[in-house]
């Protein structure tokens, strides 16, 4: 049906232009090739779905990781990390970190905060740079805690993402929140 509309459109262009019959035949041939090629695209839905097969498993791992952080169970968290982990920390101007840098950050939070609680707003599947679901996990939420040295409360909106390797270990992690602003508020006299 759409092909008929295209032919009618081309015929209308021919009638209202200075194109000769030879040029119109070339245009029709070209449009036919484009149309036939577009009908021959492969179904990529199966490929996209298959790359997202591990999302449910990875979602449970990410949720467990956050619960373990609330419980300050660093050793169990470390067991969930790939040796090749890359971490994108939330601090202003910070470079990417390796596994040891990420573990050091986790330990720093656990040593300096108590009653940590993460309340998720949205758990979402992640995607690659083309928008294809890829099994990664991301979440928006709010951290609440008490800063142990000052006993000041924290209420911090955050975004986190996790990419996983084939065995279900975290291979890339990113944390986005105002870490610098949070620390400055905890050290101010207000």
What does each model-identified segment do?
Residues 1-53:
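Bacterial Sec-dependent N-terminal signal peptides
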Residues 74-129, 133-135:
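A solvent-exposed, acidic/Ser-Thr-rich amphipathic alpha-helical stretch
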Residues 39-75:
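Short, low-complexity N-terminal intrinsically disordered segments enriched in polar/charged residues
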Residues 65, 76-78, 85, 102, ...:
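Hydrophobic pocket/interface hotspot
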Residues 140-169:
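Exposed beta-sheet edge and beta->alpha loop/turn motif
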Residues 171-190:
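Low-complexity, intrinsically disordered terminal/linker segments enriched in charged
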Residues 81, 91, 141-143, 160, ...:
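A mature extracytoplasmic/lumenal domain signature
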